[in-house]
Every structure is written in C-alpha cells, then in structure tokens.
Curated annotation (Swiss-Prot):
Family: Belongs to the OST1 family.
GO cellular component, one term: endoplasmic reticulum membrane
Segments on the Lumenal side according to the record's topology features: 23-449
GO MF annotations in UniProt: structural molecule activity
Record field: transmembrane: 450-470
Pathway in which this enzyme or protein is active: Protein modification; protein glycosylation
Gene responsible for this protein: OST1
Additional record remark: Present with 11900 molecules/cell in log phase SD medium.
Signal peptide start and end residues: 1-22
Record keywords: Endoplasmic reticulum, Glycoprotein, Membrane, Signal, Transmembrane, Transmembrane helix
Keyword Signal: yes
InterPro entries listed in its UniProt record: Ribophorin_I (IPR007676)
Protein name: Dolichyl-diphosphooligosaccharide--protein glycosyltransferase subunit 1
Any one biological process term the GO annotation gives: protein N-linked glycosylation
C-alpha cells in the first residue's frame, strides 16, 4: 500500500522546484477558469488542498503556462504542489516562483505569490483542458479555545480565502471542506450566498458565478473538530551509516518534538490521566501517550533513549516500533528523544550493472510517526572511508547539500564520507521517498582499512617483541 502511495509522491516531487528573484509581477490574462472546484482536507496535522479545474485559453495565441496563486502567508508553508491532466496519469512540470502581485485584501493590500504549471504542448485559442492541482502545507488550524480540559474535545480554527484566489477570471466555482465530523463558521458573513452548509462530514460553499481575478477579500474562518495530537518535529537529525564489511546499515534519529494541540486548562494530574486512559475506550485524544515509529521491514537492534537515558517502555512489532515517552505530551509540551535500529545493507544497496565497484544506495527520506510535520530535517548518510560520490538524486527539494569527511571508530585516514541534505517543511507522507546516492568504492579502499589496522597491530606487536628482547637490567 505504501508503494502505491509512494508512486504518486515520486511523480509529484519530480517536478521542478526553482525559486527566482522576487519582483512585482502580474500574469497575463491568458486563461479563463470555466469550472473551479476546490477541496480542503483538514483531517491531518497538515492541510491538503485539491483544485479540480477546467480552463479555457481566451488569448489569441497558443499558451503553454498556467499560474496558480497563493496567499503569501501560506506560500511559505508549502510542502509541495503538483498538477496533472484529469484524464492522464502524467504529472506536469510545476515550480514555485518568488514573483508576487499586490492585491487588495481585508487589511489593506496583500501579497500574492505564484506557482507555474507548464504544459508539454501548447493549448490553442478557445481550447479547454481539465487539470487537478494538489498542494500540501506544513500548517494547520490553531486550537480554539487555546486551553481545554484533559477529557474535553479539541477544536481548531482555520482561516483561508472563501472565493477562488486566482490570477484569472472564474465563470463558476465551488468550495468544500472535508476531514472533520463538525464544521462551524466563525463570524459568518451577512451575504447568504457566501454562507456554507453542512453535508454529512463535509461543509460546502457555492456554487458561485462570474468571480473576478484576485478575489481574496473574503476571508473564511472555520472552526472544526480535530481531537488528535498535532505532532510537529521542530528539528530532526537523521544519521545513516553504511558498512560494507558488516553488511549492515545503521539508523539513528534525534527528534525535537512538540505537540501544537490545545494546552491544558488546569495543571497536570497523574490521577486524572489514569482515569482518562481507562475510560476513553481507545478513543483518540489530543495528547500523545504512544508514538508509532514506522521503520523499514527487517529492522533489528532497536533502542530508545532521551535526555535522561535509556527508556525501556518500547517494543517492536514487524516494521512498527512503539515507544512510550516518560510522560504524556500535551499541547505545548516538548519531548526530545533518540531512536535507532539496524537493517541489512542488501535491502538498501544495489551493485551497478557492469562494475562491482559502483553502488547505488536507496535511502528513505523519513521514518517515524505518521501524521507528523517536520520544520527542519538534516539527513546525513555516512559512506565507507574511501568512497567517491558521483551522483545524487532527491525526490524532495533540499535547501542545502554538503559533502565532508568525519572520523569514526578505526578510521585511520580521512574518515567516512558524510553526505548531508537539509530539508524544510516536510510531512510524513514523504516517508517512502528515496534519496539515491551513486558512488564508487574500489576494492583497494575496501581492503585498505583492515590492512591498515593489521599493519598498526603488527607494528605494535613487533614493538612489544623488540622491547622484550632488550636487556633493560642495570649492572655494574
């Protein structure tokens, strides 16, 4: 099931993610949105948005680019976005731009940012095409109210634009919220045509007609039920060590985790917590008692530590590593911890065809708990001493990459080759994304380390032997 989901993510991340210099910019009015259906899913610790849209080229010349608009506040939280034709499974080239437009908003002028979608073939004048645009954001609603009791249900307040935010005029539009059992508008407008209505587990708006471009002056504030933790990893340091001699790959992850859920309205009570656990009957709560770490299959030698020391409240079951922190993590609480495990190297390393000295390492970008967002991720892969990297490929855009050496046990020369990727705004959906590292590891380097160690040991033993043969006695 994960592989099926990952195939979708791979296509999504293969899009370009370039950023150009910021400038005041306004896309040409080449298109008209014939039908604009927007859906926002609030069921997770992050927001996902799907726009099903039919567009028409109203210019006099063929067009190959379509611009999608973002509010500046949400633009900085984009984890990734993609687009594809409705009737095809081929993803289109997509990229985020730094170009911006100043448009009127609720509080004066607001800044509009852009993503660009490029078509493989030009769209002729008066021709229509249907697209699906997907965006995921490393953000979620804020707790409303900010403080709740341990047994009370949590609600979140989310603000977004009510009408389509687009660089083009829209003929017909609708908007649907999904992912919660209850929705309620906060300060609903007087205009009844803008009001939403509940429909089962969704909240629907529209349809609206003839909406001008950049209609962002109608803000929607929605309160919805979300009785689950909001796991946010502020910093994740992920170290992965490859050993050709031991045929193992070792993982170690250091988490700085916080729960963005509602804070306790009263002080913490262990007695009340035990009562809550006994009476909740497996009902989901807004605090964390157990973290389910999703690990690669075949993982062994698990361990779980925190700043105090080894934590024994954990157990592994197949590819799941269940860890129980020393204390429940309520809203606003933090917990720093380290987990580690070992896998067979053959599950992650492949020999290139044509040479037994060229290797391809396939490293998962993330492991860890589901439904989690990551602000900063540092992924370091330690290759054997003497390895030479000649190509890397990451399905997720990284902010920085560096190559250096770092000495470890029995490193007598330069040390392990350390390849470090830095990422921002990741979500748990990319857990199966693979970083590919192609490198050379010649036989001479493979045997150099044990031979060097053997030479040092031999030299030491010979030194001891020579010292023993010397007559160190003092005589007259």
């Amino acid at each position: 099931m994960r592989q099926v989901w990952f195939s979708w993510i791979v296509g999504l991340f293969l899009c370009f993610f370039n950023v150009s210099s910021a400038a005041q910019y306004e896309p040409p009015a080449t298109w008209e949105n014939v039908d604009y259906k927007r859906t926002i899913d609030v069921s997770n610790a992050y927001i996902s948005e799907t726009i099903e849209i039919t567009i028409k080229n109203i210019a006099s010349e063929p067009a190959t680019e379509y611009f999608t608009a973002f509010e500046s506040g949400i633009f900085s939280k984009v984890s990734f976005f993609s687009a594809y034709f409705t009737n095809e499974a081929t993803f289109l080239n997509s990229q985020l731009l730094a170009n911006s437009t100043t448009a009127p908003g609720d509080d004066g002028e607001s800044e509009i940012r852009y993503g660009i979608i490029q078509f493989p073939n030009a769209i002729s004048p008066q021709e229509e095409v249907s697209l699906v645009i997907k965006s995921f954001y490393n953000t979620v609603g804020i707790p409303y109210p900010e403080h709740v009791g341990m047994s009370e249900e949590q609600h979140l307040l989310w603000e977004t634009n009510r009408l389509p935010l687009s660089a083009y005029d829209t003929k017909k539009a609708s908007f649907t919220l999904i992912g919660s059992s209850s929705f309620e508008e906060y300060h609903p407008p007087n205009d009844e045509s803008l009001l939403g209505k509940a429909n089962g587990n969704s909240f629907e708006f529209g349809p609206w007609e003839d909406i001008p471009r950049f209609s962002s002056n109608e803000t929607l504030a929605i309160v919805y039920s979300h009785n689950a933790p909001l796991n946010q990893v502020v910093n994740l340091r992920r170290d992965i060590w490859l050993s050709h001699w031991a045929s193992t790959i070792q993982f170690e992850e250091y988490y700085e985790l916080t729960n963005k859920a509602a804070k306790l309205s009263k002080g913490f009570s262990r007695l009340e917590l035990m009562k809550q656990i006994q009476t909740q009957n497996m009902r989901q709560t807004h605090f964390v008692t157990v973290l389910d770490m999703l690990l690669p299959e075949g993982a062994t030698d698990h361990y779980f530590t925190d700043l105090v020391g080894l934590v024994s409240t954990s157990h592994a079951e197949r590819d799941h590593f269940f860890i129980r922190p020393r204390f429940p993590i309520f809203g606003g609480w933090n917990y720093n911890f380290t987990v580690g495990w070992t896998n067979k190297l053959s599950d992650f390393l492949h020999v290139s065809s044509g040479s037994d000295e060229k290797f391809v390492a396939s490293i998962p970008i993330l492991n860890g708990p589901p439904d989690t967002v990551y602000d900063n991720v540092e992924l370091s892969v330690f290759l054997p001493e003497g390895a030479e990297i000649f190509d890397i490929d990451s399905p997720v855009p990284f902010t920085n990459v560096s190559i250096e050496t770092q000495k470890s046990y029995f490193d007598l020369n330069k040390g392990h080759v350390k390849l470090t990727f830095s990422y921002r705004n990741l979500i748990s959906q990319v857990a199966n994304g693979q970083v590919l590292i192609k490198y050379d590891y010649p036989k001479s380097s493979f045997f150099k380390k044990p031979l060097s160690i053997a030479c040092y040991i031999f030299t030491a033993l010979m030194g001891v032997f020579v010292l023993k043969t010397l007559n160190m006695n003092v005589t007259n």
